Swiss-Prot record:
Keyword set, alphabetical order: Autophagy, Cytoplasm, Hydrolase, Nucleus, Protease, Protein transport, Thiol protease, Transport
Catalytic reaction equation(s): [protein]-C-terminal L-amino acid-glycyl-phosphatidylethanolamide + H2O = [protein]-C-terminal L-amino acid-glycine + a 1,2-diacyl-sn-glycero-3-phosphoethanolamine
InterPro entries on file: Papain-like_cys_pep_sf (IPR038765), Peptidase_C54 (IPR005078), Peptidase_C54_cat (IPR046792)
Gene name tied to this protein: ATG4
A matching Pfam family: Peptidase_C54
Gene Ontology terms: cellular component: cytosol; mitochondrion; nucleus; phagophore assembly site
Locations listed in the record: Cytoplasm; Nucleus; Preautophagosomal structure
Family: Belongs to the peptidase C54 family.
Protein name per Swiss-Prot or TrEMBL: Probable cysteine protease ATG4
A GO BP entry: mitophagy
Active site: C141, D315, H317
MF annotations from Gene Ontology: cysteine-type endopeptidase activity; protein-phosphatidylethanolamide deconjugating activity
Function: Cysteine protease that plays a key role in cytoplasm to vacuole transport (Cvt) and autophagy by mediating both proteolytic activation and delipidation of ATG8. Required for selective autophagic degradation of the nucleus (nucleophagy) as well as for mitophagy which contributes to regulate mitochondrial quantity and quality by eliminating the mitochondria to a basal level to fulfill cellular energy requirements and preventing excess ROS production. The protease activity is required for proteolytic activation of ATG8: cleaves the C-terminal amino acid of ATG8 to reveal a C-terminal glycine.
Amino acid sequence: METIHNISNRLQEVLATNKSVNVDTDNDSLSSNQEDNEVEKVRHLVVILGEKYSYAVDRNTGINALMQWFTTNSEIPEEILNAIRSKLNFTYRTNFEPIERAPDGPSPINPLIMLRINPIDAIENVFNNRECFFTDVGWGCMIRTGQSLLGNALQRVKSTVKDQPYIYEMDDTKEITDLFKDNTKSAFSLQNFVKCGRIYNKIAPGEWFGPATTATCIRYLIQENPCYGIEACYISVSSGDIFKENIQGMIDRYPNGNILILLGIKLGLDSVHERYWGEIKTMLESPFSVGIAGGRPSSSLYFFGYFDDTLLFFDPHNSQTALIDDFDESCHTENFGKLNFSDLDPSMLLGFLLPCSKWDEFQEFTSLLTIVNVLDGMDQYRDPDLNSNDIGNVELSPQLKLSQTPDAITDDDYVDIGALIQGNSMNINDRDNGYQEVQCKNQQIVIMDSLNETKPLEIEKVLVGQGTNLVNATTPCREAFPK
């Protein structure tokens, strides 16, 4: 009779060849039943931005085989691989159109950054212009994941307008990716994100963007440039609260349009509580989802789907050169990363694309969630310590342009609003760089008119008992994709 040790060895040999087996200890033998009996299959769900794919594997060897290809990205079913390849992925770039250093900002000559790029490029940049940034390596990851979220939202609009599935040939995405090329002429370029961040949030070139700043820049850039099918943008960085009156106002204005909804949330202190895992899956399964940006401390990723308890993401930290002819092709990849829900950072930016005609469906979808809430009004959620006389008209002026410099009193992603509560002036010299150190907070943004001007005043992240909430603004834009 074979020993248990021998049987174990033979089992491992058979499993290595991915065969289904029976152990027959009575007859002292191991026999394959692959030809004689139907092998029992187990189906696993793979979700990619609202699209669901079922993958069948043998019960006995399936987990090993499935985890192997999710570990090595090898032997992935072609249908799933095509779905991943079709999504847009924006990464660090080098040798792009120079961005001038701010007098009060960091220096482009950073040894840590220089070590992470091509040595020839580093030397060339030093000799050509020491006062300009030629790469966003080390500081641009949140901008890049914001671009990925926005780019895939635009791709969703295009596929819907043309009545096509979400997955199509990469040639169809060129008119979208051209909007993200690294030059000032491209509507959603890194250069324009940096310009917007400098004007409205006092973020200098070379400084890291937070989720709130990224969301704010996306909204302003949608306003400033032709929207290519996205007519309005609603953002909140205080919570996942969406107010009906704001959305309904946008729908009344653009009944056949699309609204990009960006929600900054924090689902825990150091990690995402397990009770939220299912809701994150539900959101990614929704046809409204355009992904999640963030999810790692000071190292943003773009999450586009999941498998079991593993999130799938694109990593923006893989740098590419900006001066290439096949730019569109470089925005697609088969390489993706995996992250367990237990390792996910709780601060993240959720993205949803809402066709105005599907507002009722979206509300029904959010009724399944506790993370995202559609609420009737916002008066009861205003901080009682904030006198209503201090808050002007919360409707943003549609004439606002990037060329203007409003009295934005934000710095980085957090500011102290104590001075605003007690008077009409604030000291913006005291910088709050404690984004990662804050363990308990109610992240906050308020956009309003100043007391004497029509320019917007933006305040982010306050530690309050009950948060005031974001208000939204939109301007008309032409339809870019013909029906």
